[in-house]
Amino acid sequence: MSFSTRRQAYRAEKQDHRKELKHVKIDESVIEKVDKLSLPKKKFYRQRAHSNPFSDHQLEYPISPAHMDWSKLYPHFYDSEKKKMTKDVTIADIGCGYGGLMIDLSPEFPDEMILGMEIRVQVTNYVEDRIIALRTNHAKENGYQNINVLRGNAMKFLPNFFNKGQLSKIFFCFPDPHFKQRKHKARIVTDTLLSEYAYVLKEGGIIYTITDVLDLHEWMVKHLEEHPLFERLSEEWEAQDKCVSIMRNATEEGKKVERNKGDKYIACFVRLPTPDII
């Protein structure tokens, strides 16, 4: 059997699990029907490293945060009697890749709903299958119920998902550097986008950035420092923050940089209070 055929068969099997378990509350009744699930194999979900954020992707998104049905992604936090969510998403990993950061953040913030946004189809499918397997295999302790992923373009539709001041943390881990100058407008940090991030981030909330590309690091720092609603946090603060430690070592891209003995550049910024208009 060729690799292409094996890949198709593997994806079909995982798609069946995804259809059955993607939106259900994983509990003892599900365990009785489903054997322990193996974690997905990344080699069957290969896709290009980056995706053009300006392309006309076929994406589903709510017309406003009030129209977003979070119960499908976080059924454990849905009160069926009151027909409402018991919590809101407060942590977002923009361009979450293969989900390593979310998975390490999950036990550290068990009462926080964490969302990964990823634009690539197969990478999103991989993270969905990874979370389904983790939820199923850790059902007795309700493990990993607080994380999920959706396919979305944060550069276009972030305010469609989140209310003003809803988020407490936003992560940008190893984003596409877009090396060519004519592509800089596609970088995840720009003046316009920073105003959108400031809108969905609460006062005192944190933007976390990490990259192995010095030019991109300097670009993000420059734009964040020049924005009136963000202020850089000190290296001493970074050294004491557990999220920085997790971000440095949890992502698949970060592990790759570590193996290649590359540099990692980190910068964190706090959301300042919005000034009163006189």
Swiss-Prot record:
InterPro entries: SAM-dependent_MTases_sf, Trm8_euk, tRNA_(Gua-N-7)_MeTrfase_Trmb
Catalysis performed (reactions): guanosine(46) in tRNA + S-adenosyl-L-methionine = N(7)-methylguanosine(46) in tRNA + S-adenosyl-L-homocysteine
Chief location bin: nucleus
Pathway connected to this protein: tRNA modification; N(7)-methylguanine-tRNA biosynthesis
Active-site positions on this chain: 176
Gene Ontology molecular-function annotations: tRNA (guanine(46)-N7)-methyltransferase activity; tRNA binding
Gene Ontology cellular component list: nucleus; tRNA methyltransferase complex
Residues noted as binding S-adenosyl-L-methionine in the record, renumbered to the chain: 95, 118-119, 153-154, 173, 251-253
Cell location: Nucleus
PANTHER family for the chain: 3-DEOXY-D-MANNO-OCTULOSONIC-ACID TRANSFERASE/TRNA GUANINE-N 7 - -METHYLTRANSFERASE, TRNA (GUANINE-N(7)-)-METHYLTRANSFERASE
UniProt family annotation: Belongs to the class I-like SAM-binding methyltransferase superfamily. TrmB family.
Annotated protein name in UniProt: tRNA (guanine-N(7)-)-methyltransferase
Source species: Kluyveromyces lactis (strain ATCC 8585 / CBS 2359 / DSM 70799 / NBRC 1267 / NRRL Y-1140 / WM37) (Yeast)
Lineage: Eukaryota, Fungi, Dikarya, Ascomycota, Saccharomycotina
Name of encoding gene: TRM8
